[in-house]
Amino acid sequence: MVDEIAGPLASAAELAGAAILQDQKLLSIGLGPDCASATVFASLLHQGVLRERPALPVVEIAAHQIESVNVGVGWAGQRIQALGQPGDVGFIFAALLSHADIQRLSQTAEQRQMQLVWFGNRGPGLNINANDEEIETRVALNMTLAICAARLIDIHTFGPMEGSK
């Protein structure tokens, strides 16, 4: 599984780094159980990972309590429509999303000319997932991937930490 996610995770870090260096922003999107992954990802990018550095431009679009996934996807789509700009990159933690939900979010992002990175499910753009796993495993894996992605974006954007080899 590590080999399957290493390449796409590195590509996601490069995509995010390029967007940041071009004064674009990242959107961290998660609903229900995936909200925690989106929150951790955004927080680590705001505060830095193990070092002081400028906060990165990341917008958190996350809701813990949603009436239904359908309502949550509608709300997230509205936020993407309002906040997304051409060249922005959306990191979507999508373990619970259906194919129809993924299509709705991807269409909204496409209208805003954004690129997407999907965690825990398959969608248009970069995919970092374990789709064959149980939902609980995908949600837990998304949390780990959120931390790894934030760390890789930090290194890609600011270089390795002093004293690290």
Q: What kind of region is each of these model predictions?
A:
Residues 1-22:
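A short, well-structured juxtamembrane/interface segment
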Residues 22-23, 86:
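Structured helix-beta-strand junction loops
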Residues 23-24, 113:
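Glycine-centered short loops/turns at secondary-structure junctions
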Residues 31-163:
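Glycine-rich phosphate-binding loops that contact phosphosugars or nucleotide phosphates
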